[in-house]
Amino acid sequence: MKTPELDARPRVLSIPAQHPFVDATWPPTAEPIRPAQLPVGERWHPHPGLEADWIRAHAGEFDIVHVHFGFEHRSLAQIRDFTRACAEARAALVVTVHDLVNPHRRDQRAHRDRLRALTAAAAAVFTLTSGAAAELAADYGVAAEVIAHPPIVPAAQAAQIMTASGRRGRSAAVFLKDLRTNVVTDPAFYLSLASGLHRSGAWLEVWAHLSSADHPTVTALQAAADSGAAPGLDLHLTARLPDAVLYRALSGCAVSVLPYAHGTHSGWLEMCRDLGLSVIAPDCGHYAGQADAPEAVRTYRTGSGAAAAEAAVWAIRRGLIPRGDVAGRAAAAQQAYADAYAHAMTPMSAGAAVAAPAMFLTEDEC
């Protein structure tokens, strides 16, 4: 690791390297280190830097390794080896905990073990809400600094889209996409949600990718819509929408319902708020803690379509809730990361980070 006297600009290996959150929070004082063999196109994982052998082979090329997410494919043994390799390379480890509960897994034991090993070896830990920070302190013994999630949609673009869309009617949007593991798959949830909306003069717009057309949840909703059994339901099957098209589709709705059975935080929630939608979120995780304004995020009992409908109807009647003051979020996160990198690069902090042992647990593989 370089010392501040030699070069004050830290060289940072970010995992992932390419992601809207990483881009928005990147400190201008940091030099990005991007491996030649990064995933191509729209894929941002897997990152080769999670391989301990890669870290050892490229030791001396970076000062900081900053892990956000995208490590669920690694075993606990591999994560331990990765943290040891970072220490051997004298690269300080920084971790931002986005997911206390992994949205791509049902059994969370292996994820918790991996997260414990990463945070135990980290010179600095961040997370996105005060509730998540409290959970990290209680369950992992980790003091995490809270940074608010930055906006997803550029402010000028969001304003233009919202102006063009006009007032947005009485529809609630649910985007199933490819039905990630944490998405509710019981059709009854969506049928109950649609029914509750319909009774109040509103309706449900469900969007799913064409690649999921044969998924049992999608086929059940399609059958209900086609037969007239769900008069408050409109189902749209599309290819993956370009961002601009997605933003316009969302902006035509009044609220967005997050159909999650488990999770922690949501970039989707932030995107919806950027576009002026109120968000109806399950009461699991820390989604409510992301609210940028009072009543901007309304919670419902996880898994209950009727409760989701009640919350959505309330939000539709409540009307537009302007986006809170989020303009400074990206700059604040950039400064927090810059400070953490600078502190980690001081000789005393660097030595402490290298000496810090990873937490050794009974391995529970995925």
Cite the ranges covered by each PLM segment:
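Extended catalytic core of nucleotide-activated donor transferases of GT-like folds
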Residues: H45-A121
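Donor nucleotide-sugar binding/catalytic pocket of nucleotide-sugar-dependent glycosyltransferases
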Residues: A123-A137, G141-A159, R167
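Conserved catalytic-core segment of nucleotide-activated headgroup transferases in glycan assembly
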Residues: A164-D226
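Short Ser/Thr-rich beta->loop micro-motif in glycosyltransferases that lines
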Residues: L176, T238, V257-T264, P282-D283
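Nucleotide-activated donor-binding/catalytic signature segment of Leloir-type glycosyltransferases, i.e.
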Residues: V218-R248
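Acidic donor-binding loop of glycosyltransferase active sites
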Residues: R248-T264, D274-L277
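Short hydrophobic beta-strand element within catalytic cores of glycosyltransferases
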Residues: S278-C284, A288
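A charged, aromatic-enriched C-terminal amphipathic alpha-helix characteristic of glycosyltransferases
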Residues: G303-T362
